[in-house]
Structure formats: structure tokens, C-alpha cells
Amino acid sequence: MTEEKKIGIEFGIMVVRAGKVLLGKRNESPETADSELHGEGTWTMPSGKLEYGETFESGAKRELMEETGIELREFRVLCVNNDKNEHAHFVTLGFLAKKYFGEAQVKEPEEITEWRWFDLNKIPNNLYIPTAKILENYKQGKFYIEGLD
């Protein structure tokens, strides 16, 4: 009997300050990068999976605090995307942090090795696919874009 594949729900939180976006470098190791979509070594925005019984708000607050130490106070839903490859399939919600407090710190070094602010016009090429899609949604002002897999 084969295992039934399931679709997960994840989110990325776009934190912007003075025209720059916060991105973290995923660990190069597949064992520690914790990426079902296999984004080892790529740049990602703070992100995570929605846990059972959690609201979008509580999940976003939890993940941003766990990964960066930043307290999310207000956000809005920016976009929804369909992210899939041969390893996994997720519906990804993009959130835009509207109000937040604190400075980014490496809180989970086994997953994210550094946090860095990038100019929105000088984003690195090696982006985690869900992050690339959320940034493209933001730049184009679109809620959904098909075909960046």
C-alpha cells in the first residue's frame, strides 16, 4: 500500500524596513534545513507551517518570534500560492508584516544560518521558491501568480 500524499499549508512573512526585505540563509544540509520542498542553501523569508488548530495570526506570530525574535504586531494577507515539486506540495500564504518590534537574530541556527536585509531591487538569485513567488506577488501587486514552480 502506498502512502497517500497530502497538501500542507505554510506561510511566508515579508518583513520590510526602509525599502529592504528580511531574508534568511537556509542551512546547506538537508538534515537540518527543515525543508520538505528542499530549499537547502537558499534565501528565504521567515516562514513555517500552520499547526493544527492555529489561526493564521497566531501561526505567523509564533514562527516570526521562533525564527527571528521579532514580535509581529500587525500583518495583512498579501497573496496565496500553490507551491509544489517532486518532494512536497503546499498552499503558501504570503503575509506582509505591517507592525513589528525587534531586530532579527539567528534563533534556530540549525535551520537558518544568518538574517540579512536586502534592497527590494537587489534580491539574491538563489531564493526559496515560495519566497520568490511572494516577492513577485508583492512587486506585481497580484494576489495569485501561476507558474513560477
What residue spans do the PLM features occupy?
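Conserved N-terminal beta-strand and adjoining loop/helix that marks the start
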Residues: 1-23, 29-30, 46-49, 80, ...
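Residue-level preference for beta-strand/loop junctions
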Residues: 5-7, 39-41, 89-91
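Active-site-adjacent beta-strand/loop module that shapes the phosphate/pyrophosphate-binding cleft
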Residues: 81-104, 131, 137-139
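Acidic/histidine-enriched, glycine/proline-rich intrinsically disordered or flexible terminal extensions
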Residues: 140-149
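A short coil-to-beta-strand element that immediately follows conserved catalytic motifs
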Residues: 71-79
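Conserved Nudix-box catalytic region and its N-terminal flanking loop in Nudix hydrolases
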Residues: 20-66
